[in-house]
Amino acid sequence: MRAKWRKKRVRRLKRKRRKTRARSK
């Protein structure tokens, strides 16, 4: 159960990080 929650949070964090990189370009 805990692993599932962490995976969901990581996926959202990864998506936000990708957007920041595109904006920097």
UniProtKB/Swiss-Prot annotation:
Entry keyword set: Ribonucleoprotein, Ribosomal protein
Gene Ontology BP terms: translation
GO cellular component, one term: ribonucleoprotein complex
Region Disordered, annotated ranges: 1-25
Single GO MF descriptor: structural constituent of ribosome
Taxonomy, superkingdom: Eukaryota
Subunit structure: Component of the small ribosomal subunit.
Family membership: Belongs to the eukaryotic ribosomal protein eS32 family.
Other observations noted: Initially thought to be part of the large ribosomal subunit. Crystal structures show eS32/eL41 to be a small ribosomal subunit forming a bridge at the interface of the 2 subunits.
The protein's name in its UniProt record: Small ribosomal subunit protein eS32
Species of origin: Quercus suber
